[in-house]
Amino acid sequence: MEARRLAILCSHLNPPGPNPTRDPTLRVSDCSSGSSGDGKVESSTLQNDCVFCKIIRGESPCLKLYEDDMCLCILDTNPLSHGHSLIIPKLHYPTLEETPPSVVAAMCSKVPLISNAIVKATGSDSFNLLVNNGAAAGQVIFHTHIHIIPRKERDCLWASESLRRHSLKLDKEASQLVSCVRRHLCSLPEEQLVQPS
């Protein structure tokens, strides 16, 4: 598992393909979020060894699809399908739990716009929206990001799609799970539970 993570990280650091200085479609991201007015991101908001932070600072190349003041969307350098893209916040948050709701909302608000363009451009039928949050879930780069993975009918991308699902048993175990989740939600500060109007 560790070797796989290292291989994926290396593929993000050294993407295969054209030399960025020769390919006019390859852009280096310029970062405006968290800036001090000169277009540079404050070092306290980014990590020196994070590949996504390097992209945001303009130190690593990327194929940029979209950018605004909160996030950018790039093509994944190790795609699961043609057009596999990543929406990345411009400030460094290692996991989804550590990412402020306003940043998550900004990223998610771009999904319809970006995914629609990707689906049309790739001739796909649909897409998966995915967040690998934590090592056990397959997160390799610890900078929050959302995957947009274009799909075509019968592409057999996920082996689990062929697995039969089991119906939820409405038993004591399920009731205990519901109670436990609700207890955890009730223990959160009220401002985390209030929905914006």
Swiss-Prot record:
Keywords from the UniProt entry: Hydrolase, Nucleotide-binding, Peroxisome
Signal peptide span: none
EC nos: 3.6.2.1
Motif (Histidine triad motif): 143-147
Compartment annotation: Peroxisome
Catalytic activity: adenosine 5'-phosphosulfate + H2O = sulfate + AMP + 2 H(+)
Region Disordered: start-end pairs: 14-43
Protein origin, superkingdom: Eukaryota
Binding-site residues, substrate: 147
Gene Ontology molecular function: any one: nucleotide binding
Short name of any one Pfam family annotated for the protein: HIT
This protein's name: Adenylylsulfatase HINT3
Organism expressing this protein natively: Arabidopsis thaliana
